[in-house]
């Protein structure tokens, strides 16, 4: 039996228009990335990346996207992402770009990176707060995320101890 190795690209869709994120759909995003790969790398790139390519996770509120592709051709996908300058959906065209946050071998490593990334973003927001109410809400969010991570780690340790 052969194991197919994949790479996961954790990306952030950055746009000034909030309607851009809300109109996200995984099929539209998948076809946009495939078309961009075909435009940049030609038929070879389109054929090589079409096997095993998928949008594994999409969060329309935060703009986080997880793309899966074959390990041998992830650099073709990665190099085509800067050429995406707009998102076209339902007759509207929104200017945007992709910011690649992390490239990982498993979804789990991308999740761990995303937790750390979100924690850093919350700390930056905490430093830029002007209102005390905002500051308390962000501190609660940071504390909650730390507590959830500690519970996960203790749950993993308990599962290992039972084995």
Curated annotation (Swiss-Prot):
Keywords: Nucleus, Phosphoprotein, RNA-binding, rRNA processing, tRNA processing. One of its GO terms (biological process) is tRNA 5'-leader removal. GO terms for cellular component: multimeric ribonuclease P complex; nucleolar ribonuclease P complex; nucleolus; nucleoplasm; ribonuclease MRP complex. Its main location: nucleus. The modification Phosphoserine is found at residue 154. Belongs to the eukaryotic/archaeal RNase P protein component 2 family. Component of nuclear RNase P and RNase MRP ribonucleoproteins. RNase P consists of a catalytic RNA moiety and 10 different protein chains; POP1, POP4, POP5, POP7, RPP14, RPP21, RPP25, RPP30, RPP38 and RPP40. Within the RNase P complex, POP1, POP7 and RPP25 form the 'finger' subcomplex, POP5, RPP14, RPP40 and homodimeric RPP30 form the 'palm' subcomplex, and RPP21, POP4 and RPP38 form the 'wrist' subcomplex. All subunits of the RNase P complex interact with the catalytic RNA. Several subunits of RNase P are also part of the RNase MRP complex. This is Ribonuclease P/MRP protein subunit POP5. It comes from Homo sapiens (Human). The gene is POP5.
């Amino acid at each position: 039996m052969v194991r197919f190795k994949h790479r996961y690209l954790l990306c952030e869709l950055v746009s000034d228009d909030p309607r851009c994120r809300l109109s996200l759909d995984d099929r539209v995003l998948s076809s946009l990335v495939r078309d961009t790969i075909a435009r940049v790398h030609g038929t070879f790139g389109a054929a090589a990346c079409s096997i095993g390519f998928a949008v594994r996770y999409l969060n329309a509120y935060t703009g986080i996207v997880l793309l899966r592709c074959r390990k041998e051709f992830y650099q073709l996908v990665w190099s085509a992402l800067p050429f995406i300058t707009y998102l076209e959906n339902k007759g509207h065209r929104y200017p945007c770009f992709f910011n690649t946050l992390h490239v990982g071998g498993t979804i789990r490593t991308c999740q761990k990176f995303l937790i750390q990334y979100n924690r850093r973003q919350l700390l930056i927001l905490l430093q830029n707060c002007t209102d005390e109410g905002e500051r308390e809400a962000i501190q609660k969010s940071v504390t909650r995320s730390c507590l959830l991570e500690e519970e996960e780690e203790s749950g993993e340790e308990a599962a290992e101890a039972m084995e």
